[in-house]
């Protein structure tokens, strides 16, 4: 078991496979640092390996909302699994700005990664080029990936059931914030969400 692990994602929107990914990381270390990527427009950049990931329509939630989602979901899951709720923290992680990582995450941690496309391979190359210790938790083809946030957002846009694809805490918050309505209106998240 590693002392400290770093795991990351956009979580736009947080779904059941995100939770499985986060819990897999939590089982591999004593303390988990969850980096939320694309924290704001200034720290978000397109990457040729996945050009759509920086598009505003693919990043509807603010960092604050995603931090609340990740925290609520992990607290709920940790309680259900008998894990220490003090064994994780959540930070911004400007994934496209590796020169800034040291300001956000411990560079001597193990960086957990799932790979299923060119973007995952690009991140592995980026992390290893920085001399980071990388542990690939899963390396599968795109069609074996499973659930995607794009699919969940699409269901929200079309008014189809989506709640069963998200952890209960995430569904509660996204309903409270009317994320489906916000997506249908084509708007970004409200800055006034508590």
Walk through the language-model features, giving the residues of each:
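Nucleotidyltransferase catalytic core that binds NTPs
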Residues: 1-194
């Amino acid at each position: 078991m590693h002392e400290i692990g770093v795991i990351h994602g956009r979580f736009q929107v947080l779904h059941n496979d995100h939770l499985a990914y986060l819990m897999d990381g939590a089982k591999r270390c004593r303390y988990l640092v969850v980096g939320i990527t694309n924290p704001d427009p200034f720290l978000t950049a397109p990457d040729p390996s996945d050009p759509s990931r920086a598009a505003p329509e693919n990043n509807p939630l603010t960092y604050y909302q995603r931090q609340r989602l990740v925290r609520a979901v992990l607290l709920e899951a940790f309680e259900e699994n008998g894990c220490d709720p003090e064994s994780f923290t959540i930070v911004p992680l400007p994934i496209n700005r590796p020169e800034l990582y040291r300001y956000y995450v411990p560079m001597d941690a193990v960086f957990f990664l799932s790979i299923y496309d060119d973007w995952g391979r690009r991140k592995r190359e980026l992390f290893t080029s920085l001399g980071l210790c990388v542990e690939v938790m899963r390396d599968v083809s795109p069609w074996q990936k499973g659930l995607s946030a794009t699919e969940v957002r699409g269901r929200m846009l079309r008014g189809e059931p989506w709640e069963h694809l998200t952890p209960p805490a995430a569904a509660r918050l996204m309903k409270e914030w009317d994320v489906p309505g916000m997506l249908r209106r084509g708007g970004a998240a409200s800055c006034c969400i508590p």
